[in-house]
Amino acid sequence: MTTSADQTDVLVIGSGPGGAGVTLKLVQAGYKVTCLEQGPWVTPPEHPHYHREWEIEKQRGWAYDPNVRGLPEDYPVTGFTTPYLMNNVGGSTMHYAGHWPRYKPVDFRKGTEHGLEGTIDWPISYEELAPYYDENDAIYGISGMVGDPSYPDRTGVDRDPPVKPGKLGRNFAQALGDLGWHWWPSDNAIITRPREGREADIAAGNELSGSPTGSLSTPTHTHWPTAIALGADLRTHARVEQIHTKNGKATGATYIDTRTGARHEINAKIVVVSASGIGTPRLLLMSAQKGHPDGLANSNGLVGKYLMHHILRVLASVVRTSRMEGYKGAFGAPLYSHEFYHTDTNRGFVNGFGMQVARSFGAAYTAMGSHTGYVAPWGKSHRKFFNEHFGNHLMVFMFGEDLPVETNCVTLDPDAKDSSGLPAARVNWEPHENDIALANYGIDRIFEAARALGAVETNDTGVLNPPPGWHLMGTCRMGNNPEDSVTNKWHQTWDVPNLFVVDGSSLTTGGAVNPTSTIGALAVRAGDYISRRFSDIVDQRTTPSNEDAPAI
């Protein structure tokens, strides 16, 4: 049974950084916004960090992979992938570390730089996005240090002081300095000063399951309280079944209450999809209907194509020359190195990578040999092993920019279903030979830095294939024309002018840094555009080209 339809100005699907950013901007401008989130609110006592067995719970109900959690709000993701997805208010920020780098100017013009495989230029520049980066940072609350010479000047942007580097950060910075390599204290979405009822970070440890105190900046703290106070209608346990269209325009959606199974309809003048780099193409493909037989916004067949994860290798080692105490402090990276960020074809590949120093995990992870492969023995030698390893652990991530390849994609699984009977997402991802060459070169450089620090028992994961899907990018990418993209530069789908996509799907290329800062900036920009051009968008019968679209 389907209830009678509600009416709203803008329907937003998904409550993570994309959906939250658009919603907040629109309700601040006075628009009526309804946001549908298929998961629940997570209250502070529900965070695993409230419990002694948090390391165990992170392997069960708080596992990164929805296939492991299997909660009613999750949907299966099949194929060659290990997806990192959360379905709850705030989206997958409930699993992020809060590392908050921006893309660099060169990241927006990779098509011009090399154009390999499916690489194209972004339809916007760093300079166009920079003021929205600033606005987004102010909403979240960011810690860090301005002045990194590898970025354009940002001296006017307010920051909290950086998270404390600890012995881990100071020791690795010394090693990088001895090699003459770039390093800089990381920007993190972690506040180090109290802010609007949120507590400052106290270096209490791992926050990879959100922060019940609010020190880790997630939309549950930074967006939704304000948006709801301004009139946003956030509906949880609301799983969207299909987006509807009529006469070439989106008209709203049908959603299922996952608690009762009841179906509800909602009509809207504009629809914004912000359901993640897997969830958004899945929903658009599920929305196949008359006039859109291959899925919504998919007349060119590119919905779900060009999936990027970042190519990833992880070094884990033990340092005996000095205590690292990596378990102390927020998990957000204390520092990074972009010494090898830019393309140098003399290395035999295009694109580059960044190094991120990461805190180590807790005692149980150490004993199990997480990332290191060195498992604590039972018996008399257990304590000796533990004393040598816990507190001496070094972990460094190599994030490389993978190429957008058309066959790396999200489709609908013909067999698997979610708890509502809707098709699961199926993912295919294979590393390009350029990605593998980049990863091999990158891990060699990280080994070099670890040796400079005195690391022993050094191990690495190899090219993680598939990589953990922390970053789900590119599957409905922005572009300059309908032949090679799904949306124009304002996130309007080429096929349906009042249907927008604003999330990791929008990213044209992936850069070699974490994408959440960029997703948030794009959301502020898209919300600004929709609020200023609302009437124009509602009246449009076709999506304008980037040249013809009305400016802000």
Curated annotation (Swiss-Prot):
<comment type="similarity">
    <text>Belongs to the GMC oxidoreductase family.</text>
</comment>
<keyword id="KW-0963">Cytoplasm</keyword>
<comment type="function">
    <text>Involved in the degradation of methyl tert-butyl ether (MTBE). Catalyzes the conversion of 2-methyl 1,2-propanediol (2-M1,2-PD) to hydroxyisobutyraldehyde.</text>
</comment>
<dbReference type="InterPro" id="IPR051473">
    <property type="entry name" value="P2Ox-like"/>
</dbReference>
<dbReference type="InterPro" id="IPR036188">
    <property type="entry name" value="FAD/NAD-bd_sf"/>
</dbReference>
<dbReference type="InterPro" id="IPR007867">
    <property type="entry name" value="GMC_OxRtase_C"/>
</dbReference>
<keyword id="KW-0274">FAD</keyword>
<dbReference type="GO" id="GO:0005737">
    <property type="term" value="C:cytoplasm"/>
</dbReference>
<keyword id="KW-0285">Flavoprotein</keyword>
<keyword id="KW-0560">Oxidoreductase</keyword>
<dbReference type="Pfam" id="PF05199">
    <property type="entry name" value="GMC_oxred_C"/>
</dbReference>
<dbReference type="InterPro" id="IPR000172">
    <property type="entry name" value="GMC_OxRdtase_N"/>
</dbReference>
<protein>
    <recommendedName>
        <fullName>2-methyl-1,2-propanediol dehydrogenase</fullName>
        <ecNumber>1.1.1.400</ecNumber>
    </recommendedName>
</protein>
<dbReference type="GO" id="GO:0050660">
    <property type="term" value="F:flavin adenine dinucleotide binding"/>
</dbReference>
<dbReference type="GO" id="GO:0016614">
    <property type="term" value="F:oxidoreductase activity, acting on CH-OH group of donors"/>
</dbReference>
<dbReference type="Pfam" id="PF00732">
    <property type="entry name" value="GMC_oxred_N"/>
</dbReference>
